[in-house]
Amino acid sequence: MLTELLSFRGRYKILHMTWFAFFLSFVVWFNLAPLATAIKADFGLDEGQIRTIAICNVALTVPARVIIGMLLDRYGPRLTYSLLLIYAAIPCVAFAAAQNFGQLVAARLALSIVGAGFVIGIRMTAEWFPPKEIGLAEGIYGGWGNFGSAFSAFTLVGVASFLSFFPGAFPVPDGPLLNWRFAIAATGIIAALYGILYYFSVEDTPPGRVYQRPRSARGIEVTTVRDFWFLMLMNVPLSGILMVLAWRLMKVGFFSPTAFTIAIIALIGLYLFQAYNCWVVNKDLLAGRKQYSAEDRYAFKQVAILELTYIVNFGSELAVVSMLPAFFEGTFGLSKALAGMLAASYAFMNLVARPGGGLISDKLGSRKMTMGVLTLCMGIGYLVMSSIPSIRDALGGGGAFMVVLALILTMSCSFFVQAGEGSTFAIVPLIKRRITGQVAGNVGAYGNVGAVAYLTLYSLLPDGDIGNRIFFQTLGIAALIVAFLCFFILKEPKGSFAEFHEGESEVVAAHGHTSTLPEDQSARIL
């Protein structure tokens, strides 16, 4: 596979076009932070208002990932991804044209939906690659696409500066002239144009394969009554974390106490609506009118553990990326620019670490053990990072050697975090194929749940070394607990290293093919 990766034919064309779709969705989703200073100065916003806009940037991502997962399973990744990328232009242009704080907030809320794009490519990639190669393929998709956030951070200021000759440029205090409006609008327009190209360039499945759809996309289909109640329990944090976001909006003064109460009632209603839809999907099972054969069953605890792994890896990544520049600046007395450059090393690891985690999962012969070992190493890495201030004090200060040592520790920990993400989504497509989109949506949503929970905790901790130490210790202990669950409760998925996906041979036989589809893929499609 590695030697064929450079080709742009067959399934590799699909992989490259899909990771780039994810890349663009993250460029759009993360286009606020690099230009926040210019936006703040242009509108005369205070720090609380900027934080409110930042909260709105993630507010709807959690429910959007769940809903996108449902749409994905019903309509297929080709149409779903194309429409999401085309949609991205609307809130981007609206944000760029905003004339007051309220319009900025509304546009950013609408734009937070774009952050759900990751889920779509998980199923698209799984449709084109056999189980034995799914880890590396999903890792490349996730790792290279995720780099869109770093690309946005490094390039948008330059783009805004280049576009400064257009009307609407605004001089940043003690900085260059930036046309942030054109820069943000451009990201959305480029995404929309690529969405059109994507629709006419890809297919949902290879030739001869039928796209498997769930019996209903209104909620996750489970195969035992006990799993239904487990599903209800695991849906609670998805609404609960939105309540935390509503509370944070009240704390910064955007919500009044009355508006906060209304939001809580609405979110309780959202949970009940979701529960009702899950009941509709599974009512025959609950009433005893339907039973699943042993071959058609799956254990929902598999999904639950993957949701927890994504909390401790992707959730912690988003949280750490947000606080790491301030951590380096405060711990070692560095300038903001240098601290930001050092912190960027954490995100850069995505290019190799996430595919690396998927490749390890493919090659070691046990996806379960790979997940457990990577999560264990991640937990140890965070605990070591919590001791950086103590090591600094023991060595007598924050000289160049200590900064380099801290950077090495950070990048090492980052590798295990992002490799763990790759390992997580090496398992997700193997749980139950016809509901892969919904499983990916829920697991992905839990990553955002973790990020909001960790950042909320961080905002409540004391400033300085004590708060940083508690924060990293919390990340480390949470990872160690989840590693235990991976070792002793997570089960190896059926057909983890098979030549074809669940039910594939029957589908192929029905269409008159005499050889397995992966062989057709490698020999004929390419």
Q: What label would you give each PLM region?
A:
Residues T52-M70, A344-G357:
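Central cavity-lining transmembrane alpha-helices of secondary-active solute carriers
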Residues G135-S164, G441-L455:
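Glycine-rich segments within core transmembrane alpha-helices of 12-TM secondary carriers
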Residues A107-W144:
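Cytoplasmic helix-loop-helix junction between adjacent transmembrane helices
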